């Protein structure tokens, strides 16, 4: 009974925090605040840090690197895959004369946005605060993930699907503006977010912190949308798909089994 009560308290806690984020983000969007995206993601970071501070366990909540050598090693491998894949596609686009003009400051801004205000902000909030909090009470363990023998926790699954993946539908909704724009693309994005939310959660469990998931998250979004400015979103989505295929094929299993 006590365990059920603690689980309920944890769910209510993180649910309130996530609802608070969406209410603020929706409001900022409804008043058409300049740079509302930057402001809302800053608020997300503040909420994530506050959650970690309140529970007084920054290392357990992934804010402090547990194994920096591990993080840097697998971050480098990940970036090599994404960079080489991007270069290949950009090169082909160049010779086909399909490259779009883009200023350097736009590339720098996109890099900052996708790695810090999307990658870091969301990993801090979801994998740092929410996943860590839920794994304190939802501690049932699974023995493998996909084809890899690796033990991971139920709280990671709940976070990745219910608190990270499914809420992507809410990006198409704004109750303050009376807007509901649900398209097949939104549902496709939501399904992929549920899957990648669990993947990033499992990697966060393996690494012990949010650094590596942040790099992976940032690389995916920067390649899709940042590089997409240069080669077009259709081609950049294909490129991201290829990079993820290579990621799972070449390094994912080694990452989870690395004893370093």
Go through each PLM region and give its residues.
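Helix-boundary and loop/linker segments of multi-pass membrane transporters
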Residues: 3, 67, 99-109, 146-151
